[in-house]
Amino acid sequence: GGCCSYPPCAVSNPQHC
């Protein structure tokens, strides 16, 4: 959920996802 479910955010934060 959250950022990792939103592709641009997941791509920008791979260390989080």
UniProtKB/Swiss-Prot annotation:
Q: What is its main location?
A: secreted
Mark the residues carrying the PTM Cysteine amide: 17
At the top level, the lineage of the source is Eukaryota
Kindly state one GO CC term assigned in the UniProt record: extracellular region
Subcellular location field: Secreted
Keywords associated with the record: Acetylcholine receptor inhibiting toxin, Amidation, Disulfide bond, Ion channel impairing toxin, Neurotoxin, Postsynaptic neurotoxin, Secreted, Toxin
Q: In which tissues is it expressed?
A: Expressed by the venom duct.
Q: List the disulfide bonds.
A: 3-9, 4-17
* Region annotated Ser-Xaa-Pro motif, crucial for potent interaction with nAChR, chain positions: 5-7
Q: Name one GO molecular function term.
A: ion channel regulator activity
Family membership, please give it. Belongs to the conotoxin A superfamily.
Write out the function statement from the record: Alpha-conotoxins act on postsynaptic membranes, they bind to the nicotinic acetylcholine receptors (nAChR) and thus inhibit them.
Q: What is known of its domains?
A: The cysteine framework is I (CC-C-C). Alpha4/7 pattern.
* Protein name, as recorded: Alpha-conotoxin-like Vn
Q: Which organism is it from?
A: Conus ventricosus
UniProt lineage: Eukaryota, Metazoa, Spiralia, Lophotrochozoa, Mollusca
